[in-house]
Amino acid sequence: MKKVEEKVILFIEKHRLIEHGDKILVALSGGPDSVFLLHFLQKYKKKYDAEIAAIHINHKLRGNDANEGEKFCKSYCGALNVPFSCVGVDVDSFAKKNKISFEEAGRILRYEIIENHCRKIGFNKIATGHNLTDNSETV
């Protein structure tokens, strides 16, 4: 086992983040944090008798790059044999309608969709690749 994986397992167990039989929905952006998270959880799901699925939110703000990100996430989940869902949202319209920033609109829509999907598929936990340096999400 790699040192980083050992540290993650110790952190999970110290803080009781995963319990036996959890069903965990991973918010998969396609960035390195969420990709590592999905890979790690899929690799160690038997240790926790956990079920893993992933969801990708296409904010449709980056043109073809957004579609490529969606394709990557779908392909990666296929390679890992992880159930995958993708939802497209119109962040621009939501932001304008509610007179808020794109960032705030994206965050509101993203978490609403993820939480609803988690309930819909009967999962009990959501995992994100968010970290302390992701200032726009921390604030």
Mark where each language-model region is.
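Core alpha/beta nucleotide-donor-binding catalytic domains of modification enzymes
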Residues: M1-L28, P32-V139
